[in-house]
Amino acid sequence: MLGRLSPLRTPHSALRTALACGLWLAACSLPACSRPRTPQEWQPREFLIALRGAPPPKPPLYAQVAQAGFNAIADGVGSDALDLAHRYRLKVVLGQIGLDTATLSRPADARNVADAIRRFDSHPALWGYFVGDETLESQLADVAALADFARRHDPMHPVFISLLPCDAWVGPALATGDYADYLERFIRAARPALLNFGHFPFREKGDSEFYFENLELIRRAALEHGLPFYPTLQAASWPGMRPPTEGEMRWLAYTALAYGAKGVVWFRYWGAPAGSRQGIVEPDGLLTERYRIVADLNADLRALGPVLLPLRPVAVYHTGPTPVGATRLPIHGLLGALEGGPFVVGEFEDAGGAKHLLVVNRDAARAVTVKLAINRPCKGLAWFDPSARAWAAQAVEVDRFQSVAEFSLPPGGGRLLRLGKATR
């Protein structure tokens, strides 16, 4: 889908329609599509908090987007949204300028698209260019050519390409039998500056068991290639998908952070059928209960994002029953024990080598008290308080061998800890 999501179509229904109609893209034969020889120059400077399902570009609607704590619209909006987005300090992923194979196959039209890119590349609201949604492996050559075209004419802004989840109904393998291979082929072909995917786990007929596996595979690919990744998080219901609870939406956000996400994209903000209460905002402007939930979570993300953005992901571990594709907390690691429920723990380092731990309650329905033992005596254990946007001292008991801390977490919530220097 290039452009705004229609009210009755989801990413997976659009894919089914495309396959049913045989809308496979032809192999690339675009003019001026030779691969650029310069490296990708774009690097993320802020933590992305974006939406899919863009509202019409009207002042009251964009004001609502900004008030909910978003800083970007990642939905291939038209150029008419740029000035309005800038008014509300929003960035946009630009679409609707002809960045598609059919248009670029005509030399005159390709020149017009290049002119459009040059016209908008210095706009302060421009975040990047929308190129592909739920990309099939058979589309990689086309998507790569589109990405090259955009990158040649504007190397300072990334292309936004959404990838399929590992359990897509066409098969996790798509054409190869291996989702990791699908990711590798995509990265080699398109040379993206970022990875985006959507794995929507909350389903009417049983939740997905492959959510953490998908996060892990994306995480590995992102680390191997030095790319940030931005998962699309489920904030709505549609046929086959149930509405997530507040705890589940918090769980989505914090588990993504634990795995090293450098931003998130909430779906679906706008475009659900009127009266369905399936999205965040209805077509008549009615705010559903999920608007307040997302706004609260975005406030946390705006506070945590600048702290997490420069940290280097080191490892991710689980306690309790280990989900598919996850790694169990080792017995003899940095953490000696983690009690109180099932948890996800993301381990990070800053530029100076200081260890950080993001501890996430894997129970999305129940608040828990965490008892955490660090296998070294730590001087100055601290936690980051999103409401104060500051580090605070974490109460801790220290002996010769361990540091033990206790704290509470809401359903699906997390706490970022910074370990001080060892005292021995």
Residues of each region from the PLM?
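Short, basic, low-complexity termini and linkers enriched in Ser/Thr/Gly/Pro
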Residues: 1, 6-17, 23-27, 423-424
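Glycan-processing catalytic domains of CAZymes
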Residues: 34-379, 385-421
